[in-house]
Amino acid sequence: IIYCLGITELTTGTDNVRSMGNLSMLTGNIGREGVGVNPLRGQNNVQGACDMGAYPNVYSGYQKCEVPEIRKKMEELWGMEAGSLPDWYGSTLTEQINECGDPIKAMYIFALNPVVSYPDSNHVMRQLDKLDFLVVQDIFWTETCEHADVVLPGCSFAEKDGTFTSGERRINRVRKAVDPPGDAKEDWEIFVLLAEKLGLKGFDFKSPEEIWDDLRRVTPSMAGCSYARLEKPESLHWPCPTEDHPGTPILHREKFAAADGLGTFFGLEYRPPAEVADAEYPFTLMTGRLIFHYHTRTQTDRSKILHYEVPEGYVQINTEDAKRLKIADGERIKLRSRRGESLPLARVTDDVAPGVLYMAMHFPNGANMLTNTALDPLSKMPELKHCAVSVEKIEGGN
């Protein structure tokens, strides 16, 4: 089973993933080649970022923050006083957006453009403007930079050394091809300089390899993945706990990671989306992507060819709906939701069902002006893929 973000960006996203796990175990399709549940992550190295502890509730290698023994171990390895690490964990970015101004006074946004990519763009902009201080670090100017007090220039994959980890847990070496332009620096260098300015100890790294070795020291599942081993063409899959361990290309061959070695089935009940079409907002808007653009177009819109293919956003509307509303193909129309409005071009098609609209998420003042901030109760993922909207013909919309 291979899935992507579409089934997770709903208030039932966790249930959807659990359903696939149930199906995989029920049919015996797990623990061997060519089977299992395999997520295609939203972009390169999402797996690697999560492995490093980018979640608010885990340290590197998915070591849980709330476990006292793990906190004690991390404090000892990092040379911290006993009890220094908190026994609670933080919130997700979607939750943090709601907390801007109170209690969050300052925010450091790194390689992200939430003004376009997060639901209810109007709300995101209002909340960011409540901050006393906002730093944005990115490789190009974005819509989020417009709200920043300081913008720091990072660099792209081709301008830095390090590792990327694929969805199959394969750790790949990344090697710098060219130097960063101008004042841009590798991300780790910016963090080291910032730590120095703040007077923080333990950040005096000189290279990505030093950082990686420090990570291996505190992360049992990656302890055996030295740079010397990663230089080899076949690379390594974690878990790889020792230098002589071959890595683990396939998980759950003999047993599951649970204490009893057994898999867990989840009993699930159907739950509708948080927001469904009604008399006031009679259309269901589904969001997704286009092949010509990537995420918020921070990179792809700088390509003349890709910009030429799709210079601005559009919404697909069923032929019968367009006929009933007297909307012509290529006409600009108004979409409204309970959160905002957007003015895309209409693309009349039979590729969507009556009562359903489809709109890509790449563009500012587009789909995420409309989408819902309702969260999955477990993952805290917002319901980006589904909301209720109305459609209005604009006089002179041509």
Where are these predicted regions, by residue range?
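Long, contiguous, secondary-structure-rich segments that constitute the structural scaffold
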Residues: 181-236, 242, 296, 300-316, ...
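Generic recognition of flexible, low-complexity loop/linker segments
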Residues: 26, 34, 91-99, 122-124, ...
